[in-house]
């Protein structure tokens, strides 16, 4: 009898998990045409500098912007409670004097990773440039952030993405250098291996990695050959049967234009792809807006790979 109860309880938990519905700020879901996301809430007159990242339970969304003058980067947060979204605010882990950007949830939603040039631990001798930090979700709040393993956080680390096994994909780029690369570090019981540069990197600029939770595909931005109009475009590669990445493929004109397309993130339910684009910028209003599109485009690209 107890075994039957356990099976029923497990089934109920799985059903509840599957029924988690995310309210994407009340926006009408997109089809296979990219649409502006949450005008006036996420896509505003500010300079958006990351895609929005939603927690798996749909209760929190974070993103980053650049404040003018000075291009000061800050992370913003909104929370869903009692059937409505809060106004945007600085999360409790923020250091408002630092440049902080590129928030990214772990697939289980228990941790948030971000890039910051805040001062590290006492007697920290490597405090130059942005490095990767991690905050733990504690109820509706956040823990005090901790600096990631020094094998990774040496200075010059920016966007990152985490697989369900804890493997870390991130960007390393020296200040003002045109050569930015995507690196991968394996997680072994909470300890990270020395980062390795992925073979998919070109001689130019690669940034903004998003890896699928099961590491089946990787989306990133690049100015490599094959970009539309010589701009920064989004590219995708798929994991082959031998465990190697396929040749990076331009994600096509449903996403990329002659403008810059950056900051790719897939929603935790796997339904939507978010990205930033400056296709709508004007002389009076420069910068990026956030767009979203049905994530079925990923499977379309896989079939044509």
Model-assigned labels for residue ranges:
Residues 1-18:
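Bacterial Sec-dependent N-terminal signal peptides
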Residues 16-305:
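Short, conserved micro-motifs composed of acidic
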């Amino acid at each position: 009898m107890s075994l039957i109860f356990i099976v029923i309880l497990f089934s109920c938990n799985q059903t509840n998990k599957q029924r988690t519905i995310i309210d994407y700020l009340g926006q009408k879901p997109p089809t296979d045409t990219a649409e502006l996301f949450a005008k006036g809430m996420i896509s505003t007159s500010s300079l958006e500098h990351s895609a929005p990242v939603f927690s798996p339970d749909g209760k929190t969304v974070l993103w980053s912007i650049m404040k003018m003058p000075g291009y000061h980067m800050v992370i913003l947060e909104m929370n869903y409670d009692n059937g409505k979204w809060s106004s945007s605010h600085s999360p409790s882990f923020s250091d408002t004097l630092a440049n902080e950007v590129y928030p990214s949830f772990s697939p289980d939603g228990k941790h948030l990773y971000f890039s910051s040039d805040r001062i590290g631990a006492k007697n920290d001798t490597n405090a130059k440039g942005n490095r990767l930090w991690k905050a733990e979700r504690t109820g509706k709040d956040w823990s005090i952030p901790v600096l990631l393993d020094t094998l990774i956080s040496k200075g010059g680390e920016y966007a990152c993405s985490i697989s369900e096994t804890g493997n870390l994909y991130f960007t390393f780029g020296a200040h003002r250098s045109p050569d930015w690369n995507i690196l991968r570090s394996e997680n072994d019981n909470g300890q990270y291996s020395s980062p390795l540069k992925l073979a998919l990197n070109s001689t130019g600029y690669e940034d903004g990695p998003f890896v699928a939770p099961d590491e089946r595909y990787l989306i990133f931005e690049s100015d490599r050959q094959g970009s539309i109009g010589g701009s920064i475009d989004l590219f995708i590669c798929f994991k082959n049967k031998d465990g190697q990445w396929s040749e990076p493929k331009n994600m096509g004109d449903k996403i990329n234009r002659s403008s810059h397309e950056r900051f790719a993130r897939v929603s935790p339910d796997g339904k939507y792809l978010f990205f930033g684009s400056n296709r709508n910028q004007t002389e009076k209003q420069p910068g990026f807006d956030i767009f979203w599109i049905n994530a079925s485009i990923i499977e379309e690209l896989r079939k044509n790979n």
